[in-house]
Amino acid sequence: MAPADARLHTSYAQFPSPDGYGTVRGYLAQPAKSKGKLPTVLVVHENRGLNPHIEDIVRRLALDDFIAFAPDALFPLGGYPGDEDKARELFGKLDQAKTREDFLAAEDFLKHRPEGNGKVGVVGFCWGGGIANFLATRVPDLGAAVPFYGAQPPAEDVAKIKAPLLCSTPARTNASMPAGPRTSRR
């Protein structure tokens, strides 16, 4: 989908993250013509940063009448470098505790968007799946979490999850999931 699609308003947004790296920057998209307050989706990239593919996902969600936002975890280190291998190398330099705080700030940013309905869901891919799981353990009123792979939360944090989850994991990853109630449909 073209970045300049007339059906959408897109921009890069920045806001403070006092407990994280100080500032979060990411890609924001919403329908150009919407009626009423919209639900919001936090899109969390894999260990490659905010690349064109993730920006495309944000735009596609906006076409489905969501306000979507994808923070760039690599912003504190200069942002997505345009090269997937270099991006992966940069991930090793991130302070993960600060990065997690940045994603908590991003969830709060979306929750308080004036054009939003106050409900936030999160979808994360690979590394971002771990962030989606983390947010599910830390945000009691999270609307939903959809992790595609990613690190599982510690077993002691599973009981804190109140949001509906839709988890996509390969069979060998399921072995790492904490024991607990599960529902599986095929």
Predicted regions and their residues:
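A short beta-to-alpha transition loop/helix N-cap that caps and shapes the active-site region
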Residues: 76-81, 152-158, 175-176
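Primarily recognizes the serine-hydrolase "nucleophile elbow" in alpha/beta-hydrolase
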Residues: 103-162
